[in-house]
């Protein structure tokens, strides 16, 4: 293995929060190739302002994996398109668990995707199922051409993973990206999370919500995109999408753990999970 990869603060936060999920051999090899030694003021501040931040991220990732697992039997040979894939080793999880059900995985990101590709190549040389695209996903013309170059086919059912992305782009940009994936049969499934607007957050969690939003906005230098449930319904209406699920994090926790230790009501947890067909 080459020198370990140093990761940006946001990626470190996400990877460390979900470490308990990375238990399979390929995922463990991948995590061992990443350098987590550097301290991060951003990471520490987020944990200080919101003690449940790691739990929230872990539940979000577990929810995405659960929705993938539930979808896999629906169609043979599905495509998986990861937009804003980041450094999460979700592709390794899929290749270890569902190699016969997947025809292609395409990861798209505008940062660290080449380094990630190199790590994957060292772990599983020459794997034919996975492709990597370095691209700003909001550049829809370039994104579309790159998807076609890398084997995306509209007629093959696909799972579009849009995890941890809508917080950082506008709703208009989201709609433009999703327009690329509309199909007459509506056989693509989109999985995403979104940040809740304040009116959706119970009073006891509002201080956490405001604090996390402020830390994130100071770090990225622009507002975080927040939405209420009506906003999400409006986006789906623009896309002629068919809603599958809207899942508050309290429901996610209940499904995954059998209880509610952290989040007890809708609106707690900062984000909610959504899946829809397009």
What function would you assign to each model-found segment?
Residues 205-221:
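Short, glycine-/aromatic-enriched active-site segment of Class I SAM-dependent methyltransferases
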Residues 222-246:
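Short alpha-helix
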Residues 1-81, 85-133, 141:
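Rossmann-like AdoMet
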Residues 256-278:
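Core SAM-dependent methyltransferase catalytic element
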Residues 142-154:
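Short amphipathic alpha-helix with an adjacent loop that forms part of the alpha/beta core around
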Residues 152, 156-172:
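A short SAM/SAH-binding and catalytic strip from SAM-dependent methyltransferases
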Residues 142-143, 168-181:
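A short, conserved alpha-helix within the catalytic core of class I
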Residues 185-198:
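Conserved beta-strand signature within the Rossmann-like core of class I S-adenosyl-L-methionine
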């Amino acid at each position: 293995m080459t020198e370990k990869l140093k990761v940006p603060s946001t990626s470190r936060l996400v990877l460390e929060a979900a470490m308990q999920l990375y238990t399979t051999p390929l995922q463990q090899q991948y995590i061992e190739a990443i350098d987590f030694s550097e301290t991060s003021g951003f990471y520490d501040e987020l944990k200080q302002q919101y003690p449940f931040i790691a739990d929230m991220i872990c539940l979000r990732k577990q929810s995405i994996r659960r929705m993938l697992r539930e979808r896999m039997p629906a169609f043979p040979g599905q495509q998986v398109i990861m937009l804003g894939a980041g450094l999460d080793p979700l592709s390794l999880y899929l290749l270890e668990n569902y190699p016969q059900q997947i025809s292609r995985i395409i990861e798209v990101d505008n940062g660290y995707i080449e380094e990630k590709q190199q790590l994957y190549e060292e772990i599983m040389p020459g794997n034919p199922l996975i492709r990597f695209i370095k691209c700003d996903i909001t550049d829809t013309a370039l994104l579309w051409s790159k998807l076609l170059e890398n084997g995306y086919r509209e007629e093959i059912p696909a799972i579009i993973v849009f995890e941890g992305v809508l917080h950082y782009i506008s709703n208009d940009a989201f709609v433009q990206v999703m327009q690329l994936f509309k199909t007459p049969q509506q056989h693509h499934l989109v999985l995403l999370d979104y940040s809740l607007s304040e009116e959706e957050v119970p009073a006891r969690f509002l201080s956490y919500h405001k604090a996390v939003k402020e830390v994130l906005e100071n770090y990225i230098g622009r507002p975080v995109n927040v939405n209420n449930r009506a906003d999400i319904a409006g986006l789906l209406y623009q896309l002629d999408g068919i809603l599958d699920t809207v899942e508050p994090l309290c429901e996610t926790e209940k499904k995954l753990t059998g209880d509610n230790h952290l989040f007890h009501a809708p609106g707690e947890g900062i984000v909610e999970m959504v899946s829809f067909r397009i």
